Amino acid sequence: MSRNIRTFRDIGNNDDGGPDSDDSGADAAERGAPQEFYAGSGQAVQGPRGAAARGPDSEAHIRRILQAAEVVQPEGGEAPRGRPSGRETISLTLHLWSDGLSIEDGPLMSRQDPRTIEFLESVGKGEIPPSLVQQYPGKEIDFKVNRHHEEYVAPKMKPFGGSGVRLGNVVPTVLGQSSSSATTAGTSSATTDHNPDHTAENEAKQLEDAKKELSTNMNEPTTNIQIRLPNNQRLVGIFNHSHTLEAVRTFICTARPDMIYAPFQMMAAYPPKPFEDESQTLKDANVLNSVVAVKILPTTN
């Protein structure tokens, strides 16, 4: 008789110490097989191989994800998979670091941040977090877990190759500033909200971190992009023409980590038009030396 696939909803019934919470998962990990789980709405979670999956971890939510990343093989055959069909599938990886977590090549998310806990709670309920639903509308998501034993290392951006033509000074008020004054323009107008960490000093540091991670190649054509946030704050970044709109999204989330948890849409400022394909280069999207507006999208329960 075939055994059943463990789902995220089973966690609520088989929490720590439950009758079925350890045996089969431990057996699968001892065999060294990758543990994989497909949740509803096209979501999947895959745990690491072998004993690393059972390593100590202080965060209960991390343990729950690893416990959920379990498929019990039926006797004499492969386990059935609850993967929907008929839609394009996107594979994403949740990286667990010793000092936090990240999604794909995105910025570090602190495990102590309540919004990170909420993000993981969505995963633990078998739901795709709203920010991912917005970023990949109408697509199935294979969500995998990859555990690391070292601290987070920011990856270098890998812009698409290709050539471009330098354009004129379309936004003179932005391009006429020095690099230091441009940084000040992006931070001095910041308004302090309920989060005490949102000081001008911290925001300036976060913006500099975002610029470093962007790894702009100054030997290739460059463009200044001014990003207008929902609170009317402005960020200024120097991009290559071959950078994509996805790189702009990563830049925003690194410069303002709050945006990691807020589903948002990037739009051309004038005429107002949302960008449907974020894999486009800035040159192809016709936003060189331009303004990109950020619009927060409503979340759905």
Swiss-Prot record:
Coiled-coil intervals, chain numbering: none
Record key words, sorted: Cytoplasm, Cytoskeleton, Differentiation, Nucleus, Spermatogenesis
Positions of the UBX domain: 218-295
UniProt-listed GO biological process terms: autophagosome assembly; cell differentiation; establishment of mitotic spindle orientation; Golgi organization; masculinization of hermaphroditic germ-line; membrane fusion; negative regulation of protein localization to centrosome; nuclear membrane reassembly
Residue ranges annotated for the SEP domain, each copy included: 89-153
One function term, GO molecular function aspect: K48-linked polyubiquitin modification-dependent protein binding
Expression (tissue specificity): Expressed in the germline (at protein level). Expressed in spermatocytes but not in mature sperm (at protein level). Ubiquitously expressed. Predominantly expressed in the spermatheca.
Stretch list, region Disordered: 1-61, 176-200
InterPro entries: NSFL1C_SEP_dom_sf, SEP_domain, Ubiquitin-like_domsf, UBX_dom
Compartments, record wording: Cytoplasm, Perinuclear region; Nucleus; Cytoplasm; Cytoplasm, Cytoskeleton, Microtubule organizing center, Centrosome
Superkingdom of origin organism: Eukaryota
The keyword Nuclease is annotated on this UniProt entry: no
GO terms for cellular component: cytoplasm; cytosol; nucleus; perinuclear region of cytoplasm; spindle pole centrosome
Low complexity compositional bias, start-end: 178-192
Main location: cytoplasm
Reported phenotype of the disruption mutant: RNAi-mediated knockdown does not cause any visible phenotype. Causes 82 percent embryonic lethality. One-cell embryos have defects in pronuclei positioning and spindle orientation during prophase; however the duration of cell division and establishment of embryo polarity are normal. During prophase, increases active air-1 and to a lesser extent zyg-9, plk-1 and spd-2, accumulation at centrosomes, centrosome size and microtubule growth rate. Simultaneous RNAi-mediated knockdown of air-1 restores normal pronuclei positioning and spindle orientation but not embryonic lethality.
Signal sequence coordinates: none
SUPFAM superfamilies assigned to the protein according to its UniProt record, in alphabetical order: NSFL1 (p97 ATPase) cofactor p47, SEP domain (SSF102848), Ubiquitin-like (SSF54236)
Family: Belongs to the NSFL1C family.
Function: Ubiquitin-binding protein which acts as an adapter for ATPase cdc-48.1 and/or cdc-48.2, conferring substrate specificity. Together with ubxn-2 and ubxn-3, plays a role in hermaphrodite spermatogenesis probably by promoting the degradation of sex determination terminal factor tra-1. Probably in association with ATPase cdc-48.1 or/and cdc-48.2, regulates the centrosomal levels of kinase air-1 levels during mitotic progression by promoting air-1 removal from centrosomes in prophase.
Name the record gives this protein: UBX domain-containing protein 2
Gene: ubxn-2
